[in-house]
A protein has these predicted regions:
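Residues forming the Rossmann-fold NAD(P)(H) cofactor-binding site
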Residues: 80
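Conserved small/polar residues in nucleotide/adenosyl-binding loops
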Residues: 107-109
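Peripheral/terminal regions associated with large enzymatic or DNA-binding modules
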Residues: 74, 88-93
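Active-site acidic-Proline motif in GNAT/NAT acetyltransferases
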Residues: 70-72, 76, 104-105
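Generic enzyme active-site microenvironment
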Residues: 63-64, 99
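Conserved GNAT acetyl-CoA-binding A-motif
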Residues: 91-102
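Acetyl-CoA-dependent GNAT
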Residues: 1-59, 65, 70, 83-85, ...
């Protein structure tokens, strides 16, 4: 799915760079996490969250690095639901802020 997202978003990445970016996050890296969206046997997407520190917010913050939903299930509110539930899912991590950047050219309305 990461390859599909990068292709769609015009991100020039290789298998090696994708593996180097994903593998630590799948193995309990303190720098971030990857969560599958949907059932583990047949996920319909994923979200990558990375962690940092914010002087402005006075503590740890998170950044939505990637959010991907398979084309066949888009337009059903899946991404909206994930983003709405994200603060609840990360509440125990002590986050002070969650940041999201949007590439408007990728929005399919």
């Amino acid at each position: 799915m990461v390859h599909a997202f990068h292709d769609e978003a015009g991100i020039n990445s290789t298998e090696e760079t994708r593996h180097a970016g994903v593998e630590p996050l799948l193995n309990n890296s303190p720098y971030g996490a990857i969560y599958l969206i949907g059932p583990a046997r047949a996920p319909i997407g994923y979200i990558v969250i990375t962690f940092g520190w914010s002087v402005e917010f006075g503590g740890m913050d998170a950044f939505v690095d990637e959010l991907y939903v398979r084309p066949a299930v888009r337009g059903r509110g899946v991404a909206s639901e994930v983003l709405t539930e994200l603060p609840n899912a990360l509440a125990g991590a002590g986050l002070r802020a969650i940041h999201l950047e949007v590439n408007l050219s990728l929005i399919h309305i």
